[in-house]
């Protein structure tokens, strides 16, 4: 522990109690801990990473804690069961996992296994996801486990789904477009099958935040009320109203305000009740996704948070639907939710190392000499004059003199050496002013530019585009923090820049209570470079948390940085074991994605080296070393070693 700094300070600084409870914390050694079951049994994350590296599992690395999945699933069902008991709701809850959140085999299979006691099912939104579900979801002889088919559907999709009903799956085809109904009925008649049909309603109620734009009357998916009535009339005319089983809606992926959920439940409840009164064979109400994750720990309706907990969510769904049904004397439906983000987000932690840093230049300038240029002397005078009374005025003077120096340099009146001298003094002014600023309770807006200039850049062994695409694409906030040295005071403020040759490959927005920070508090690196062969090398590890939903599957190959190493940890005999290791892409793998064959590339290079040998541009030893390195690189991880 450094003087005047403790792990309690780090806990408050990074808000880990807010977004991480009950799974993540900090131990006395200053390392992040993981409690996969949300109990007292804790793993030291830093020690875990070090042990994985000894197994030749290099960073960047994604660690999946299967027991967190199990715990999230159990908590969701516990909350729904408590709400059902509290409000005397005369029916049950049967959840489904939306496969689109994270389609990886180990995760889906784990959720199917953990979900068996709850009759927990799957939701699919495409033909490939349907193929996963049909082969993964066990047949539940009680018929309570749901397989819900959402998304746009063609004849192949619908025929496969209808035939799969005969295996024993409780499969419901949710109509998103009117034409899907007619194709479904045509196939059903041809195969002599009775379909189970649902309708997805476009509610007037809209979600908030980024995903709110995909809901409401202009939503991408779903049926308007007139279209739902068309479905009703079509089924009635064919004497198939008993096949209309489910009403589905979805008002967004991350609903931060409980008020929006209440409004949606009321609207959907009325639609459900009236369909029942009209004679439809309604049985299920699927409230979709939206159960939010508190990424910043503020517990507010900020877009990266939520102003409710899981029990509040369950209570409002159960109570709201019961009220609607009681008023109309309709038996309440089986409740269904597609809470993928809330189930999967916490179980994955992304670990990466810092490879270097770039801090604002500062070297104590030597006093100026009388013969130096007037602007350089003016900058020096400014530097010497800075104090707590005039620091704002001196900042403006320093900026003006620096701009004049650059102007004169551009017209050829100052030398490169003179410009360097002026910039050195300018940065010294900036550091002195910034030190004063940090001690003030209030800083004027015109000094914010200086604060931004004083932010360091930490270069990380990662591709944001591959491992955290939402941070780049939609400015999604994820908790990021060091996983060790948390008993030391962080002295640097930094943004994170990834390995890609793209200016968007950075993270420059970080969680804060009810706000977004432009920089992250980090520790000074203990190494000037990333030379891991140095016996005194000390790595600096950062973790990005709550990344278990969407990020892996949406990542892309920008600059051909491929999939990263993944490990699965699970509790076995009261000890946490490495359950699976999924090795990340090597260079040959990603080159094949873009249609290059490794053996062809090697042969081309061999020919080039032979030509170079003939022209005496290379020695035989050099050519063999080049070919050896080329072969080794093809088989190596796409990230820095």
Model feature map: region roles:
Residues 59, 63, 85-90, 278-282, ...:
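Flexible, glycine/charged-enriched surface loops at secondary-structure junctions
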Residues 84-88, 104-116, 327, 450, ...:
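A short acidic-Thr-Gly-centered motif at the start of a beta-strand
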Residues 21, 26-103:
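Low-complexity, highly charged intrinsically disordered N-terminal segments
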Residues 15, 316, 322-641:
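Charged (often Lys/Glu-rich) extended helix/loop segments that serve as interaction or gating elements
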Residues 31, 39, 68, 102-104, ...:
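Short, glycine-/Ser/Thr-/acidic-enriched flexible segments
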Residues 88-286, 293-296, 307-312, 320, ...:
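Active-site-proximal beta-alpha core segment in soluble small-molecule metabolic enzymes
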Residues 1-32:
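Charged, compositionally biased N-terminal leader segments and the immediate start
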Residues 67-75, 230, 267, 316:
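A non-catalytic, amphipathic alpha-helix used as a structural packing/dimerization or gating element
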């Amino acid at each position: 522990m450094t003087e005047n700094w403790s792990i309690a300070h780090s806990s408050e600084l990074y808000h880990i109690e807010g977004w991480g409870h009950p799974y993540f914390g900090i131990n006395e050694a200053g390392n992040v801990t993981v409690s996969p079951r949300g109990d007292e049994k804790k793993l030291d994350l830093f020690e875990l990473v070090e042990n994985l590296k000894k197994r030749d599992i290099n960073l960047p690395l994604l660690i999946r804690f299967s027991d967190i999945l199990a715990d999230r699933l159990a908590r969701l069902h516990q909350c729904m069961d408590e709400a059902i008991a509290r409000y005397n709701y005369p029916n049950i809850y049967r959840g489904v996992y939306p496969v689109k959140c994270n389609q990886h085999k180990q995760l889906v299979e784990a959720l199917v296994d953990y979900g068996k006691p709850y009759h927990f099912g799957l939701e699919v939104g495409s033909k490939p996801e349907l193929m996963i579900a049909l082969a993964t979801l066990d047949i539940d002889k009680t018929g309570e486990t749901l397989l819900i088919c959402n998304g746009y559907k063609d004849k192949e999709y619908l025929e496969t789904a209808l035939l799969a009903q005969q295996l024993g799956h409780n499969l419901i085809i949710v109509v998103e477009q009117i034409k899907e109904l007619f194709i479904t009925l045509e196939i059903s008649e041809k195969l002599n099958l009775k379909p189970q049909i649902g309708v997805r309603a476009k509610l007037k109620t809209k979600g908030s935040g980024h995903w709110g734009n995909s809901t409401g009357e202009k939503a991408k998916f779903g049926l308007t009320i007139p279209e739902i009535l068309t479905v009703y009339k079509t089924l009635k005319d064919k004497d198939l109203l008993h096949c209309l089983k489910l009403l589905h809606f979805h008002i967004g992926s991350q609903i931060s305000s409980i008020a929006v959920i209440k409004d949606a439940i009321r609207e959907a409840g009325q639609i459900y009740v009236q369909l029942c009164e009209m004679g439809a064979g309604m049985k299920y109400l699927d409230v979709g996704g939206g159960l939010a994750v508190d990424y910043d720990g503020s517990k507010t309706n900020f877009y990266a948070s939520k102003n409710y907990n899981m029990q509040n969510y369950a209570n409002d769904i159960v109570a709201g639907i019961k009220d609607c049904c009681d008023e109309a004397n309709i038996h309440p439906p089986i409740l269904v939710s597609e809470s993928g983000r809330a189930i999967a987000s916490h179980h994955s932690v992304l670990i990466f190392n810092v490879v270097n840093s770039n801090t604002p230049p500062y070297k104590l300038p030597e006093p100026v000499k009388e013969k130096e240029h007037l602007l350089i002397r003016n900058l020096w005078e400014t530097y010497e004059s800075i104090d707590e009374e005039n620091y704002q005025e001196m900042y403006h003077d320093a900026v003006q003199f620096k701009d004049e120096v650059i102007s004169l340099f551009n017209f050829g009146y100052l030398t490169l050496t003179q410009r360097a001298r002026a910039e050195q003094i300018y940065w010294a002014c900036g550091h002195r002013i910034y030190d004063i600023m940090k001690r003030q309770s209030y800083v004027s807006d015109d000094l914010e530019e200086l604060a931004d200039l004083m932010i360091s850049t930490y270069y990380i062994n990662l591709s944001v585009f591959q491992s955290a695409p939402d941070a780049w694409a939609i400015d999604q906030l994820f908790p990021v923090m060091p996983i060790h040295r948390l008993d030391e005071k962080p002295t640097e403020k930094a943004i994170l820049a990834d390995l890609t040759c793209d200016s968007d490959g950075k993270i420059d927005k970080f969680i804060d209570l009810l706000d977004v920070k432009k920089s992250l508090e980090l520790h000074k690196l203990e190494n000037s470079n990333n030379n891991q062969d140095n016996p005194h090398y000390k790595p600096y590890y950062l973790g990005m948390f709550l990344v278990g939903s969407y990020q892996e599957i949406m990542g892309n190959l920008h600059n051909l940085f491929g999939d990263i190493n993944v490990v699965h940890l699970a509790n076995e005999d009261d000890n946490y074991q490495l359950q699976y290791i999924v090795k990340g892409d090597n260079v040959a793998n990603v080159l094949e994605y873009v249609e290059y064959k490794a053996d062809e590339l090697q042969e081309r290079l061999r020919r080039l080296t032979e030509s170079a040998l003939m022209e005496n541009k290379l020695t035989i030893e050099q050519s063999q070393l080049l070919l050896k390195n080329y072969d080794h690189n093809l088989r190596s991880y796409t990230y820095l070693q």
